[in-house]
Amino acid sequence: MEKNILEYVGKSLYKTHILKEMKRYVVFRARCAMHSSKVDELLQFFAANSKRQAWLQGAPALLEQTTRAFFYKGSTWDERLELVQNHLLIMEELFKPELMDKLYSKGERVQLWEDSYDDRLLTLQLWFHAGQRKEGCLSLALFYEGEPLYQIMFWLAKNKTDGKNVIYIGALQGPQNGNELIKGMTKAFFGYRTKNLMFYGLRCFAKAIGVENIFAVTNDGYYAMNHVRVDRKLKTDFGAFWQECEGVICSDRRFYIMPTAEHRKSMEELKPSKRAQHRRRFAKMDEMKAAVKAAVDSYKK
C-alpha cells in the first residue's frame, strides 16, 4: 500500500494542525491499515492510467469515502469499493476525458442549464467537492447568484436486475433559510416548486445519458442512520418527496425507485383556470430538458 498517497489523501481532507482533525486523520490511516488489501485494490484502480491518477490527486475524497460508513445505511467496505469504481467506470464509458478532468482533476463545475430569477443568474451545474462525499460521488446543484441553493448528491451504478445504468441518490439538500426566495422562485416558474425543478434537472440529466430508473435513499436508508439513535428522527423527510415524484419503495427498504420521465397532466385533466400556467411551466421544463441534453451531448463520447 502506497503510504505517500494515503498521507496525501488524509492531509488533503483533514486539517491536521487542529487536534480534532488530527485524530480523524489517525483514524483514517488506521482504517486503511486494517483493510490494506481493499485499499490496495482501489489504489491499483487509480494507478491504472494517468487520467485516473489525476482524478485521485484532484479529488482525494474518492478514496477516503470508501473507508467510512457513507452513501447509505449499512454500506460495507466491499460495496463502497464497488460503488466508487463502478461510478467512475460508467463515467469513463459515457463521457470524454475533458468532463472527468474538469469534475475530478480540477474540481471545476460543469454548467448544464441557465435561466434567471429577479434579474439574477440561476444555473444548474454538475459538481463534486469533499463536502459532498458522504452521500455521493457527484452532485447536481442549482446555483443562484453563484451560491448553491439546492443539491442532489448521487452516483452512477449498474442495476442489479438487468445490468443497465441507473442513478442512486444519496441526499437532497435545500436552503436552511430561504422561504421568501423559494416562494418567489416558485411563482416565477409558474407554480413549479424549486425542489421539483431541481429534481427535474436530474431527470433531464438521467434521460440524456440513457438512464431509465432513479433510486433514492429512504429516511431509514440515509447514511446518517448509521449514527442516529432508534428513538430519534431525521430532520429531513426524504420519503414524502420521493413518493410525490412517483417513487415506490423497493424490496430493499433503504431505497425508492422512480422513473426518469415525470408524469405530466394533459390539458384536459387540468382546470381551465390552470391551463395557461401549466403551458408556460411545461415550456420552461422543455427548455431545461433541451439545454441539459445539449450540454451533456457535448461531453458524451
How would you label these PLM feature ranges?
Residues E246-K301:
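Charge-rich, low-complexity intrinsically disordered segments
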Residues M1-G184, Q277-K301:
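Non-catalytic substrate-recognition and accessory regions of acyl/acetyltransferase enzymes
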Residues Y150, N159-I249:
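Acyl-donor binding region in acyl/amide transferases
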Residues W113, V228-R229, T260-K265:
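Charge-rich, low-complexity amphipathic helices
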Residues G58, F154, N179-L181, A206, ...:
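Generic alpha-helix signal with a bias toward terminal, lower-confidence helices
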